Every structure is written in structure tokens, then in C-alpha cells.
């Protein structure tokens, strides 16, 4: 039979007590007493888990090397993260425009719907790039999103002109990303940009350019009636089709 001391927990000790017996007199029996040793209590479980995890984590905190990464240059990975930030910034600007035009003292609700649609499209563009980053084995590094340059968009014409400039900036960034991908010999990234972004950007620039031109012809921004009619008929029809 194994001695009971083998089954004692590390931090529990025993003491002896006297038990009086009518037949046998006094006897020594072990009594279980939770008398704790000097190294009790042990480290908290959460701290132990964190220490174990940190011992396995690389120094840069980036996680284990990707098993799916192939022909994906670090410069392309960084440029995609910058493009994600730009797409989110564009979405932020269009969201500001949308809720400016839905104010009670502006009340151009088709302008509001138009820019809200653009905001959602830009957010989808950012998410699509995030999915690409994961598919290629890159690391998504989100950055601070810059606030819009203005909160008062003044007129429909001013907002359309700002949107046109913004779309050109986004397009230029995409073109530079495409050039980088080509220089690094990454046909998949080139095809991805051509399929999902470049053609759509050209269409958006043309659409916004047409809107600016038509508003100017109608007498905006001096004529408030021009923006009202443009909101009601031109953008109203577009929103119905979309």
C-alpha cells in the first residue's frame, strides 16, 4: 500500500493529532490541515496563460508567418493598407455629405441618398481590399481616418466638385498601386484591380463630371431652383434606378 504522503497536494501539509482510545490509549493520527507553504498561491491562471502566449508570439507581434503567402511583395501589402485607409476616408466624406443634405435647412434628399450610396460603395471597396489582404497572406493594419476638410458643404455643386476631386485622387492611388503590382511581378493583384476597381472609377469620374456640368448649365449655385430641380429629377431618377 502506498503511503498517504504521496497523495498530498504540493501546497498542503499535515499535522498529527492525539486520539484517545479506551482500549489502546493514545494514538497518533494524521489530520489534514490546509497549512500553506511559502510559495502559495501560485501565479494567477490568466497571467500564466498570457505569459505562455507571449513566449510563443514573435517579437513584432505580427503572428506566425502566413502559409498562403506567395509572390506578395511587402511594398504591395503596405500600399493596400494605405488604399484601405483612403477608401474609408472617401466613405467618411460621402457620409458627411449625405447627412448635410438631409438637414432640415437644406432638404435636398436625393442628394443625400446619392452620397449615402457612394459612402457605402467606398466602404465595400475597403472591405474587398481587406479580404484580398487576407487571401494573399498579408497583414491588415488599419490607420486613423482623417476627418473631412469641411462640415458645411454649402451647395450641391460644391459637393459634386469635391466628390469629383476625391474620386480622381482615389483613382490615382489605385493606378499607382497597379503600377507597383506590375513592377513587382504580381499579375493577380493587377487583375484584381482591373476587374473590381479601375473601370468602376472611370465610370464614377464620368458620372460626377456630368453632374457638375449640368448643375453649372442650370445656373447653380446662384440659382436655388437649379439645385432643387436637379435633386428632384436627375438624382431622383438615378436613385430610383439604383
Curated annotation (Swiss-Prot):
Keywords: Iron, Iron storage, Metal-binding, Mitochondrion, Oxidoreductase, Transit peptide
Gene3D superfamilies on file: 1.20.1260.10
Alphabetical list of SUPFAM superfamilies matching this protein: Ferritin-like
Binding site for Fe cation 2: 122, 167, 201
RNA-binding as UniProt keyword: no
Cellular component GO terms held in the UniProt record: cytoplasm; mitochondrion
UniProt catalytic activity: 4 Fe(2+) + O2 + 4 H(+) = 4 Fe(3+) + 2 H2O
BP GO terms, sorted: intracellular iron ion homeostasis; iron ion transport
Any one Pfam family match given in the protein's UniProt record, by short name: Ferritin
Binding site for Fe cation 1: 87, 122, 125
Domain Ferritin-like diiron: 70-219
Matching InterPro entries: Ferritin, Ferritin-like, Ferritin-like_diiron, Ferritin-like_SF, Ferritin_CS, Ferritin_DPS_dom
Key word Iron present: yes
PANTHER family on file: FERRITIN, FERRITIN, MITOCHONDRIAL
Protein's job: Catalyzes the oxidation of ferrous iron(II) to ferric iron(III) and stores iron in a soluble, non-toxic, readily available form. Important for iron homeostasis. Iron is taken up in the ferrous form and deposited as ferric hydroxides after oxidation.
The protein's assembly and partners: Homooligomer of 24 subunits. The functional molecule is roughly spherical and contains a central cavity into which the polymeric mineral iron core is deposited.
Stated family: Belongs to the ferritin family.
Protein name as catalogued: Ferritin, mitochondrial
Species name: Bos taurus (Bovine)
Lineage, top ranks: Eukaryota, Metazoa, Chordata, Craniata, Vertebrata
Gene name of the record: FTMT
